[in-house]
């Protein structure tokens, strides 16, 4: 269709029709969940590799094993907002994490974490005492604070990061 035809059609649109289109667009924009990244500032160091953490996300859903509802903090060097927004399952939320750390809360007396570097070619999992996290905000919709630990004695990473993560996704499937 030539561009002139499109312009003529738009000009001939009745004002109430244009208002309906605008209202529909606004309704869609408001109803779509946005996985906007929170801020993170710090690093994860593992042997000779370092990742600068810049993005923080908080997601909520069932644990893959226990099916118990947990919160997962994802700290990443790269923006994975679009990937998290597209997730239908909890296990998907950190599957595209290539440089960073995910930490599971509410699943027991210790924090479970998974560190990845170099496009997931380097991975390390461990557990930590909850005391390594000092929160300044911790409720159903937001977690903020400082996360510092040194797991190098066990062959793991050293992490020092300050973050502020809003809840970006709630899931019902593990």
Regions found by a protein language model. Give the residues of each.
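Edge beta-strand at a domain terminus
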Residues: 38-39, 43, 146-174
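Bacterial N-terminal signal peptides
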Residues: 19-31
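A short hydrophobic beta-strand element
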Residues: 139-147
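Surface-exposed helix/loop patches within compact recognition domains
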Residues: 63-140
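Bacterial N-terminal signal peptides that target proteins for export
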Residues: 4-22
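Charge-rich, low-complexity N-terminal segments
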Residues: 37-58
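Sec/Tat signal peptide C-region and signal peptidase I cleavage site
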Residues: 32-36
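Amphipathic hydrophobic-ligand
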Residues: 49-50, 123-129, 157-162
């Amino acid at each position: 269709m030539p561009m002139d035809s499109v312009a003529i059609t738009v000009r001939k649109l009745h004002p109430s029709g244009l208002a309906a289109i605008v209202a529909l667009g606004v309704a869609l924009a408001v109803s779509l969940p946005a996985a906007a990244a929170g801020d993170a500032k710090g690093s994860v160091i593992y042997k000779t590799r370092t990742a600068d953490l810049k993005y923080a996300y908080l997601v909520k859903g069932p644990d893959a094993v226990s099916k118990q509802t947990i919160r997962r903090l994802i700290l990443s060097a790269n923006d994975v907002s679009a990937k998290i927004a597209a997730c239908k399952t909890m296990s998907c939320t950190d599957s595209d994490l290539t440089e960073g750390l995910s930490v599971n809360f509410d699943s027991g007396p210790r924090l479970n974490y998974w560190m990845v570097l170099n496009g997931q070619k380097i991975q390390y999992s461990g557990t930590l005492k909850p005391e390594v996290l000092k929160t300044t905000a911790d409720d159903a919709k937001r977690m903020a604070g400082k996360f510092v630990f040194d797991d190098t004695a066990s062959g793991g990473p050293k992490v020092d990061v300050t973050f502020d993560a809003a809840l970006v996704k709630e899931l019902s499937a593990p």
